[in-house]
Amino acid sequence: MARRRIGQATLLFSSVGAARQSTLDKLLGLIDWAPVEHQLRDVSCSAKGEPAWPPLALFKAMLIAVWHDLSDVRLAEALDDRASFRRFCGFSAHEPTPERTAFVRLRAQLVAHGLNQALFEVVTDQLRAKAITVKTGTLVDATVIASASHADPEAGWAGHQRRKAIHSFKAHVGADADTDLVEALCVTPGNVHDGRAGGGALPEVFGEVYADSAYRGPIFGAAVAVRGGSPRIVQTSMWGRPGDDTLRKLRRWNYDIQRVRCRIEKIFGTWKRSYGLRRMRWRGLAKATLQVHLTAIAYNLRRSLTLLSNPAA
């Protein structure tokens, strides 16, 4: 397939800007992008009769869109205008950049080839190798994300106690308890119970598993046990006799779990507050899954950069 060659001309910057690395420059050097490019080798995002844009450049641009919560239109405008965006994607100073439809075609190709999981793994495996701590446990939880439209037949209604039901998808996430890096995830319609889908959010190595009371029951417990893990699940009741200290034991058990488990809420907060994942941008489970994987990749890159810069973060 014919592809454009980009980055051949020299980028021109002032001497002041050249001496100072931007966050995107640091992220560019954080991993080896060649394995990512290899995963994208069969992707073609060309319009009819035109050479295709390099898929790695478009993929990097979509990460920028996550970090800055940009629509396709605003991403195309920003990529044409900002030197740091061009540098990160590999474009030189004065060459043309992709129009918004190129990102639409890339998403369609990623969904068609089923590459979201492979891209997530090839990036996360590199970041995990840079981890400066020894894994001791895994945080598992789910977050509800409103669907792009109530007419989306692949979403489902999710309600909780007295809260208003939301037409949504649900992201089930497993994160490292020490680094807060997302290691595994799956996406389901919003009406799928956390405990039933939680097994899909377990990484290969997970140690003790911290989760809230929604994960009580045999299904999730069996998924943890079959891989040799140890479940640490919030309980709502405990057997005891009148007058003993059962209630105190229950509170202590839950406190020890909650003070670790609650850290996964910071991940969801970043996704929704900073990365715009309060609502799905596109209809359908496949595109919703792609959006969550892109968000997780972008989050892991930024989180790893923070950890390497400040191990105590």
Put a short name on every predicted segment.
Residues 48-56, 163, 283-291:
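Structural motif
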Residues 17-68, 102:
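Basic, short loop/linker segments at the boundary and entry of helix-turn-helix/winged-helix-like folds
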Residues 1-34, 38, 304-313:
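Charged, often Cys/His-bearing segments associated with DNA-binding zinc-finger transcription factors
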Residues 50, 64, 77-80, 90-91, ...:
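Polybasic low-complexity intrinsically disordered regions
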